Amino acid sequence: MAGRFLRGAGLHAEIFPDERIPGSYILAIGGAEQSHVNLKHPGEVFYEYLRRIANVADLAAPPGAPMRCLHLGAGALTLARYLQATRPGSEQHAVELERELLDFVVDQLPLPEGTDLTVYIGDARHEVAFGDVDGPFDLVVLDVFAGEDAPEHLATADFYAELLELLSPRGVLLVNIGDDPPLAFAKRQLGAVLESTPHAALLADASMFSCRHPGNVVVAARREPWPQEWTAALLAAGPHPAGVLTGAELRSFAG
């Protein structure tokens, strides 16, 4: 097990082997699991919500074609590894608040050979507005929310509008939201995204839509209409039981 103290967060980060899956490792921060990485097979994604995000990435461009992707909240760079494995030559950019975290992750869990990743250390919204982050991107992934204690300046309709402006014409914004029943925070974030575009979907384990369980939901939003064939593909891809809300059902869920 390797560890490092994150001065910005005031928490201890650890990376340790996942005994269930050979060649895999878990990143924990403050004792809570944050990321899972399979070094032997980076094209395999363990966490359910991230598998759903990866499934959208699979649909967003022809198979194997490189993409431009912006990761806001880097974690253990699991998705960056996935894109390099499935779309070699992708141009990737990551914004991470904790320099110590990113250094620790890359030192302990090296990126796949050939990974083209540019890293920006700072606040996600500040870097998007004033930094060197320049679109267009085929994917923008925001993965910083864990319920009501989320950074307020990131959980706004204005910020989602800024992120949508970074997309290529057929690009996708993906927002991971962890929440507890009755999913009030997740519903507010979905509503905030819908203020800027009606072309969106909500992805989750189907049981999450009852609002009786804690877990993650993923908002996927576009500037162009949501392809209905994507809904069928995502339902088939899982993880199962997969749920996808669009159109009137999506608006009703947002409230």
Model-found features: residue ranges?
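A generic structural signal for alpha->beta connector loops
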Residues: 89, 114-116, 170, 197-199, ...
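A short, structured beta-strand/loop element
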Residues: 21-37
